Amino acid sequence: MMMNILSNAKLLAHHKGGGSTTNGRNSAGRRLGAKRADGQEVHAGSIIYRQRGTKIHPGKNVGRGGDDTLFALTNGVVKFERLGKYKKQVSVLPVEDAE
């Protein structure tokens, strides 16, 4: 009788199976932000600010790329300024105007 009960007993796992996890990854940073500082000289085509959306708006002599990157249209000096309470913009002042 005792032998019959033991033969019907099942061995159950006492550790969970090694399933996959949901959160086991992380993407690399996108290297966004300022690439040139206020007062720094830049050449035409230089990237000034890399961003997603328009955190900083383009001002005089600054263009905006398809990915919202701000870049210099002419040689000059970078000038960051505030537009009202919430907006910021960056301009490039030609070298003769910056002094």
From Swiss-Prot:
UniProt keyword terms in alphabetical order: Ribonucleoprotein, Ribosomal protein
UniProt-annotated stretches for the region Disordered: 13-65
Organism domain of life: Bacteria
Gene3D superfamilies with a match to the protein in the record: 2.40.50.100
Coiled coil found in the keyword field: no
A GO term from the CC aspect: cytosolic large ribosomal subunit
UniProt cross-references to NCBIfam families, sorted A to Z: L27
Listed PANTHER family: LARGE RIBOSOMAL SUBUNIT PROTEIN BL27M (PTHR15893:SF0), RIBOSOMAL PROTEIN L27 (PTHR15893)
Protein name: Large ribosomal subunit protein bL27
Source species: Lactobacillus delbrueckii subsp. bulgaricus (strain ATCC BAA-365 / Lb-18)
Gene, per the UniProt record: rpmA
